[in-house]
């Protein structure tokens, strides 16, 4: 597991109070992990803070799964 992946899992476990085993790359933040719209906004804000990036709203709305979060962050951090 990459460092980015581990940080994403840790953030999701903390914010959504789910078991780490539930946070798979295929897990949908809303449908599988129970995040509501406010939870998702809080997750995005925490990803921005931890990874020191800005995630535009038009891009954030396309991020639905844990795998998409990791993929997006890896791409953005590689651009820095």
Swiss-Prot record:
Disulfide bonds: none annotated. Residues 2-77 form the Carrier domain. GO terms for molecular function: acyl binding; acyl carrier activity. Pathway: Lipid metabolism; fatty acid biosynthesis. 4'-phosphopantetheine is transferred from CoA to a specific serine of apo-ACP by AcpS. This modification is essential for activity because fatty acids are bound in thioester linkage to the sulfhydryl of the prosthetic group. It comes from the Bacteria. Belongs to the acyl carrier protein (ACP) family. This is Acyl carrier protein. It comes from Amoebophilus asiaticus (strain 5a2).
């Amino acid at each position: 597991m990459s460092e980015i992946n581990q940080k994403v899992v840790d953030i999701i476990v903390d914010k959504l109070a789910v078991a780490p085993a539930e946070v798979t790359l295929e897990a949908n933040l809303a449908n599988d992990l129970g995040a509501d719209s406010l939870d998702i906004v809080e997750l995005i804000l925490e990803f921005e803070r931890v990874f020191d990036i800005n995630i535009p709203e038009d891009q954030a709305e396309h991020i639905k799964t844990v795998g998409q979060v990791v993929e997006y962050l890896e791409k953005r951090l590689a651009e820095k």
